[in-house]
Regions:
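Active-site beta-alpha loop architecture of Rossmann-like, nucleotide-cofactor-dependent enzymes
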Residues: 22-23, 303
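P-loop NTPase switch/communication element
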Residues: 1-4
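ATP-dependent carboxylate-amine ligase
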Residues: 95-96, 147-160, 164-356, 361-396, ...
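Acidic, Mg2+-coordinating active-site environments of NTP-dependent enzymes
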Residues: 8-19, 25-29, 34-188, 263-273, ...
Length: 419
């Protein structure tokens, strides 16, 4: 309350704040005059504080059922399972209900298309259509954005001003944030996801946007909800390609015991590594990254410390990723060749969304998911072996001319295959 009073004296007349379930239950937000309240989503969290999910939801709903005054507004998604409760609260307390969704909503989503590192969104509001490029990844980001638009409009901002400003939006620090693209075009994201639902949303979002199962580095915090640990393992097993279990603020718990509880959630132990030291786990994930792959480092996001009992160590996932010297990492010969080749071929392939795991000029030993480059030498012309390369499961062939009786969709033409 003191901070809000200070802000008001500075002439600021609109404030957006997070109403935590702890603060609501402890009546720390009582007395504040909320004009708009947003309900984004509800999932398992804070069960070290609340008795169960029912009590947790009850605490969150205090904002809507007690603190909002008559004729003020609730903003939410009309597709979430908590919507009927919010609708009933709005009716009983005579509140205005503003919604986002694909039908029967204040803002109606018409279409959404994934692009490289952004989304093309079309929506309708007050009988007017808007089409915008949103520089964020994930449908959850779109939902949050649309709810923010309604809240901003309710704060007195003009809708056209709001829409024009969207192109300037940047990811929230540590929230599904692209930190680095490696020479092999693998992308590294960090995210604060530390609950089963948040982790599932992030992994699923990356999988849907880039059409590939991400690799994931994650752990679970000590002295927090223990029930979620094996559940998070199950989520990773469902959506991730490679899984690296590491430490994430063990606090006064045994890090080894936390890792064991995580491991208990896996049905299979395939493609899973336990690497306690977080920086080493991140480095290992980068070393093992595939060309055009995705790595998600989850759990800490924006945080800059790692807590082991009474020790608080400086540790930032973002800093670790940025400071890794790719040239000094000891890649396997296979991976290093892929990095060099994909760095050269990136400009050629980026427009076609081509996925591959290696490059070869030998049609006889080419492997599945490789690209074959048809090079003309003194004695042989690689174009004569394109058919053989495709028969041996090459994904695509790079050529400088069309080949008879070969599907053109399997050919990537360039002027000179050697260059």
């Amino acid at each position: 309350h003191r901070e809000l009073s200070r802000i008001k004296k500075l002439g600021i007349n609109n404030v957006i704040l997070e109403a935590s379930s702890h603060g609501l239950l402890q009546a720390r937000l009582n007395g504040l005059d909320f004009k708009t309240a947003i309900f984004t989503n509800f999932s398992q969290d804070h069960l070290d504080y609340h008795k169960n999910m029912k009590d947790y939801l009850k605490a969150k709903l205090i904002l809507f059922s007690k603190l909002l005054k008559e004729k003020n507004k609730i903003v939410t998604d009309n597709k979430i399972k908590e919507f009927p409760k919010l609708k009933l609260i709005a009716k009983n307390r005579k509140l205005n209900l503003l919604t986002i969704g694909t039908e029967n909503s204040t803002i109606k989503i018409n279409s959404l298309t994934n692009k490289n590192n952004f989304q093309q969104l079309s929506f309708r509001h007050n009988n007017k259509k808007y089409t915008i490029a949103v520089p964020l990844i994930g449908f959850f980001q779109i939902k949050n954005l649309l709810m923010a638009i309604l809240a901003a409009e309710n704060s007195g901002l003009n809708i056209n001003t709001i829409v024009k400003s969207i192109k300037k939006i940047k990811e929230v620090n540590g929230r599904l944030q692209l930190i680095r693209t490696l020479p092999n075009q693998a992308k590294i994201f960090i995210d604060y996801a530390h609950t089963p639902n948040a982790l599932e949303v992030s992994l699923k979002t990356l999988k849907e946007h880039y059409n590939i199962n991400p690799d994931v580095v994650f752990g679970c915090g000590g002295e927090r909800d223990k029930k979620k640990r094996p559940i998070m393992a199950k989520v990773c097993e469902k959506y991730a390609e490679k899984i690296y279990i590491t430490d994430d603020n063990p606090r006064n718990e045994s890090p080894q015991l936390i890792r064991q509880m995580i491991m208990s959630g896996f049905k299979k132990r395939k493609n899973i590594q336990i690497i306690p030291l977080r920086s080493k786990a991140i480095t290992t994930a980068i070393i093992n990254s595939k060309p055009n792959g995705i790595i998600l480092i989850a759990g800490k996001g924006h945080e800059t410390v790692q807590i082991y009992k009474n020790k608080i160590l400086n540790s930032s996932d973002k800093t670790i990723v940025k400071k890794i010297n790719i040239n000094k990492i000891k890649y396997s010969k296979k991976n290093y060749n892929q990095i060099l080749n994909t760095e050269i071929l990136y400009k050629l392939t980026k427009k076609n969304n081509i996925k591959f795991e290696g490059v070869s000029i030998d049609s006889k030993i080419i492997q599945k998911k490789n690209i074959f480059i048809a090079i003309k030498g003194k004695n042989h012309d690689g174009h004569s072996f394109v058919k053989e390369a495709l028969k041996n499961k090459a994904n695509f062939c790079i050529v400088n001319r069309n080949i008879k009786n070969i599907n053109r969709n399997k050919l990537i033409k360039c002027r000179n295959t050697i260059n």
